[in-house]
Each structure stands twice: as structure tokens, then as C-alpha cells.
């Protein structure tokens, strides 16, 4: 959530940001917000004046009663009327506060100066040129769907029978390979990169979604259990960030770095017309997430660290990839700056997003009220929050299967995963 003081002082900058994000239609909300804010200020001032008058007259009434000289009846009637007026103002003030908060919750984050201005994904900049590794794929390639079916390690049809399209089933050595990926990534982040592992809940309340910015703007993308009023998490970012919701963090503990595995659930509303085959777009997938809480002056250095940590996984797996710096028209509403890491699919002949690494500055912390004090007597400040996929396994699995396939139709397991799988190859004989 944006700081309303920033909007008051620099409304033109916020309007420019909306235009750069291709959200010019949201511009009237800024004027509406400022009008409501002025109305609120006037109401607060009037209410405070009346409360001061009530306090003053209440003392006069007490003096009259104490002295026994004169009558306080008329003053009491006047103050009853004043109290009723104050109560009405407080009710109106509550409604105004709700309107203001609704607008603030719907506004996107500001943008970092380094974010390129652009209209769509076509305007994203290549931050790191494609990183390649030597593969000898000089034979007719199978895509991940064909490999999964022929080796009996993936079953999308039975997943659809159980739950509907978009819910894959991993079988036998496919399940072992998926588990190996998750364990390898967690071990890298905790043992090499210094993150603390967390195993979070897979369901959260609405306040948690609100804290990280998925609610109310992206309410149509999350699965809701109506009876218990809980939501399936779209990413571990939600429960992990909200671990510290409403807390005052000790500056000595910053930065805080967490790594977490979770299943992720997304309705993918509006995906009609997009490529939804196999792992390309699913409703349930596995992901290892990195989340950081930092001091404001350290957050952009932390963003580069998160990106490098995600890249380290792909380098170890020898998966070809590239890094994009997202433009203003493609970056998520919550982020001030974001890198996308894309893996190469040799069968599809295109790049697939496998990780997003974002800095939210104080946008989430303000919504979730996560603060710290730089010194014991200092004014509390909001922390900066960051997150990055480290990584999502679904599209990573696409690239892995397709790059590590052989002419005979088997899959060689990447060397760094063999310690976890306890096998080197997946062949037609897989169970």
C-alpha cells in the first residue's frame, strides 16, 4: 500500500506511474482520494473542536454543580446535542476511512527508476543474455508431455479424472525426481545461501492475502474454502511474509531470510487462449520460495542476491536460461522492480518463466504493519520485503526433461540430483 503522504505531496508522480503501468484509467482515483482525504481532515478538525468545546463546558457544568450557584440544565442540553453531532461525525469519519483505504488498497506500487518504461512483455529488457550449456540434441526431440507419458512418470489424464485439468500427477521415478528437485533447492538456499527453512501452512486467512497484496485485487485468482473462510495459497510468499504481520522487528535481526517449499494453487482465471498443455499452465504446482525482510537502504542489494541465488540453482542443474528486467507495463502491481528468470524449452523452442524476483519496498510491510526501529529511541520504520522463486518446479521440469533426454527416449538425471534420486537414469522400464 502506498503512503498517503506521498500521494498528497507528489500526486503528479503517482499519476505518471499509473500511466507508465498502462493504468491511465485509474487516474481519477487519485483526485477522488485527495478529495476524500481533504474531507476527512475537515471532519477531524470539526470533531476535535467540538470535543474540546464539550470538555470545556463539562468542566463549567461541574463547577456550577459544585458551587450550587446557577442552573446547568441548558448547558447539559447543549452538550447532549454536541455529543450527538460528534457521534454522527465519527460515523461519517469511519465511512470516509473505509473509502480511502479501499482506494489505497487498489493502487499499485511505485516504480524504481531503473525499471524501463514499456507497454507489455514485448518491451521487457534482457538483463542477462542467455546462459547455455553443451547439449547434443541432434535427434528428433520429444516434449515434456511425450516424455512423461512414454516413461510413465507423469499422468495428466488421471490427474484430470481426480480433480480436473491442470492438476498433474507424478509417478514413480517422476515423483522421486520432483522431490529431488525440491530437496536440492532447499539445501542450496539453506546450506549455501544462508536462508532459514520454513514449512508453512498451505491455507491462509483473508488478512494474510491482504498483507501481501493479493487481496482484493487478485481475489478471482485464489481458491476459497467458504465454510472455513480460508484460502489456498498462490505462493509461499503469503504465509511467510505474514509470519511477521503486526510485529516490530529488532533491527539486529535484519535482514531476515526465509526459504520455504509449498504447493501453490492458482485458479488461472482469464487463461483462455493461452498455452495450457502439460506443465505450461497448471492450477497446482510446487515451488521453493525465498523471502527477505530488510532495512530500506539494503533492499536493492538484497534483490540482486535473491536473483543470483535463483540463478545458482539453474547453473548447478546446467539448465539454459536468461534473465529479463520487466518493464513498467508488465511488472506486477505489488513490485517496484522485478526480474524474470526464464528457462529454455528445446522442444517448444521458447523461453518459459521459472522464477520472478521482486522488491516490494514498504508496499507489503505497510499493508501488513511490519516495522522496525533502527535505534531504541528512533521512530518506527516499515521494513522492505522481497521475494523470489527459487524455483517453481513445473516449468523447470519441462526444461530439465527436454534437455536431459537421450536419443533412446530415456532421461539422464542431472549430476547434482543423483544424491537425492539414488538413480542416474529414467528408462522405459520405470515403474
From Swiss-Prot:
Residue numbers binding ATP: 266-268, 282, 353-356
Annotated L-serine binding sites: 235-237, 289, 389
EC number(s) given by UniProt: 6.1.1.11
EC top class named in words: ligase
GO molecular function, one term: ATP binding
Annotated pathway: Aminoacyl-tRNA biosynthesis; selenocysteinyl-tRNA(Sec) biosynthesis; L-seryl-tRNA(Sec) from L-serine and tRNA(Sec): step 1/1
Keywords: Aminoacyl-tRNA synthetase, ATP-binding, Cytoplasm, Ligase, Nucleotide-binding, Protein biosynthesis
Tagged with keyword Cytoplasm: yes
Reactions catalysed, as given in the entry: tRNA(Ser) + L-serine + ATP = L-seryl-tRNA(Ser) + AMP + diphosphate + H(+); tRNA(Sec) + L-serine + ATP = L-seryl-tRNA(Sec) + AMP + diphosphate + H(+)
Compartment(s) where it occurs, according to its Swiss-Prot or TrEMBL record: Cytoplasm
Gene Ontology cellular component terms for the protein in this record: cytoplasm
Any GO BP: seryl-tRNA aminoacylation
Gene3D superfamilies (UniProt xref): Bira Bifunctional Protein, Domain 2, Serine-tRNA synthetase, tRNA binding domain
Nucleotide-binding in keyword set: yes
PROSITE patterns: AA_TRNA_LIGASE_II
Comment on protein domains: Consists of two distinct domains, a catalytic core and a N-terminal extension that is involved in tRNA binding.
Quaternary state and interactors: Homodimer. The tRNA molecule binds across the dimer.
Family: Belongs to the class-II aminoacyl-tRNA synthetase family. Type-1 seryl-tRNA synthetase subfamily.
HAMAP family hit by this protein: Ser_tRNA_synth_type1
Its biological purpose: Catalyzes the attachment of serine to tRNA(Ser). Is also able to aminoacylate tRNA(Sec) with serine, to form the misacylated tRNA L-seryl-tRNA(Sec), which will be further converted into selenocysteinyl-tRNA(Sec).
The name this protein goes by in its record: Serine--tRNA ligase
Gene source species: Pelodictyon phaeoclathratiforme (strain DSM 5477 / BU-1)
Higher taxonomy: Bacteria, Pseudomonadati, Chlorobiota, Chlorobiia, Chlorobiales
Gene: serS
